[in-house]
Design a protein with these regions (language model features):
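Flexible interdomain linker/hinge and immediately adjacent N-terminus
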Residues: 56-79, 175-209, 253-260, 292-301
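N-terminal DNA-binding recognition helix of tyrosine site-specific recombinases/integrases
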Residues: 22-65, 104-105, 116-118, 151-182, ...
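Single conserved hydrophobic/aromatic residue that forms the stacking wall/gate
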Residues: 1-9, 14-16
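Active-site/catalytic core of tyrosine-dependent DNA strand-transfer enzymes
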Residues: 269-326
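Conserved tyrosine-mediated DNA breakage-rejoining catalytic core shared by Y-recombinases
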Residues: 228, 237-275, 363, 411-412
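Acidic, low-complexity interaction regions
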Residues: 106, 243-244, 298, 305-321, ...
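Basic, Lys/Arg- and aromatic-enriched nucleic-acid-binding interface segment
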Residues: 202-232, 336
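Active-site-proximal segment of tyrosine recombinases
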Residues: 234-236, 330, 340, 347-359
Length: 412
């Protein structure tokens, strides 16, 4: 605190202007302040408390095997923004229990909604100190607040499910029976299906023209990702021994982070591109577990956020825009959509498409077929309109017997 006051008195900047990869501006603590925080932490006495007693957990210090996606770098869990001390301790116990059965990403979602809930309680129900005091009325008011909040996560069913899971776990641990029966099924809003978008051929050409000018291994990674049609996590965790040949056909083995491993045939060109990527990594880092590695930590895969930052910086620098005149976002899933739509245009059956995309079920294929039909309609609309105009002009010369046709078509 004294250092902070001295810096303020010296007119040294204590807040920095930061620009995100999306071009948005925010303000945060200056590098100088963060530096002093780290110095004080290093020089301060060692915290000998058990890890679960601390307000910030180092995951590596927990006696639990953490289930994580290796393309995301999650090192800590932060409870400091759960403002009520008793609720914070209750939340810690629940998080520790859930970590033994759930992936770290799921637990992070539960912790995020608990922070939002804690902030709401602090403002609207400041007398509530423990989860044992939360009743149905408080919950309903919060859910209304959540559903009307102007954020991208408003009324998101996953948030409500995460809150329910967290409060019910707390109820079981502390025998707060009320929490186990607090929610009813109608509390969970229906999921809003996101618009299923896909890049046009022109958009893909513009993107790839710039991607190929980026760092060679990142460019290879993104092109391979497009050609495989995999999830980005599956691409970034490809193994150096993934390539095989079966009956003269190049094959690739893909380890799906979410489900299982599977094989699929690939072209000779893609096999060569993969081989070049493997050789690049071996020459630069030696034997590694993954083809695309984190340069600072070669034992880990290339990180999703590192790729995202570089691609978005390129888009901002080049002012690269889509067909609607908007700057491109970083949509690795859009490459997968493009791949899926192309498979439907080849008239493959649903089972084959699902296999090539690594889907366990066939029901997702309908989205690709629907988008393919929509694209066909959009791309042929001008031609179909010209054909219709020619027909209507002919009808206009054919007399009264076709008057009803003209009226039905809305033609003057």
């Amino acid at each position: 605190y004294e250092i902070h006051e001295r810096l303020v008195g010296s007119e040294m900047c204590i807040r920095d202007r930061k620009k995100s990869v999306y071009g948005t501006v925010s303000y945060g603590e200056a590098v100088t302040i963060l530096y002093f925080r780290n110095v004080l932490k290093f020089l301060g006495p060692e915290d000998l408390r058990d890890e679960i007693e601390k307000d910030v957990w180092e995951l590596k210090n927990l006696d639990i095997k953490i289930r994580s996606n290796p393309i995301y770098n999650v090192k800590t869990l932060d409870f400091r923004k759960i403002y009520q001390p008793d609720i914070r301790e209750e939340c810690k116990k629940a998080v520790y229990m859930n970590l033994q059965y759930e992936a770290i990403g799921t637990v992070q979602g539960e912790l995020t909604i608990m922070r939002i809930f804690s902030e709401y309680l602090q403002k609207e129900y400041s007398k509530i100190k423990s989860c044992s005091e939360i009743d149905r009325e408080v919950l309903e008011e919060f859910l209304i607040h959540l559903s009307t909040k102007d954020t991208s996560h408003s009324a998101n069913s996953s948030y409500v499910i995460s809150l329910r899971r967290q409060l019910e776990t707390i109820g079981k641990i502390y025998s707060y029976e009320r929490l186990e029966h607090l929610f009813i099924n109608t509390d969970i809003p229906p999921e809003v299906n996101a618009e299923f978008r896909v890049y046009s051929d022109d958009e893909m050409k513009r993107l790839n023209a710039e991607i190929t000018q980026m760092d060679v291994q990142i460019a290879r990674c993104l092109l391979i990702h497009q050609m495989l049609g995999t999830r980005i996590s599956d691409t970034l965790t490809l193994r150096p021994d993934c390539l095989t040949r079966e009956n003269g056909q190049d094959m690739i083995e893909i380890y799906q982070v979410k489900t299982k491993r599977y094989k699929k045939p690939i072209s000779k060109e893609l096999a060569k591109l993969l081989q070049s990527s493997i050789e690049y990594t071996q020459e630069k880092f030696g034997d590694t577990e993954y083809i695309f590695v984190n340069e600072k930590e070669p034992d880990r895969p290339m990180q999703y956020m590192a790729i995202k930052t570089k691609v978005m910086s390129m888009i901002q620098e080049k002012q690269l825009k889509d067909d609607h005149g908007e700057l491109f976002g970083f949509g690795t899933h859009m490459f997968r959509h493009y791949y899926g739509v192309k498979l439907t245009e080849m008239h493959l059956d649903d089972w084959t498409i699902a296999r090539l995309l690594g889907h366990k079920r066939l029901n997702n294929v309908q989205h690709y077929r629907k988008m393919s039909n929509q694209r066909m309609a959009d791309e042929t609309r001008e031609v179909r309109q010209r054909m219709s105009d020619i027909i209507y002009m002919s009808l206009a010369r054919w007399g009264e017997e076709y008057e009803q046709i003209r009226q039905d078509a809305g033609i003057e």
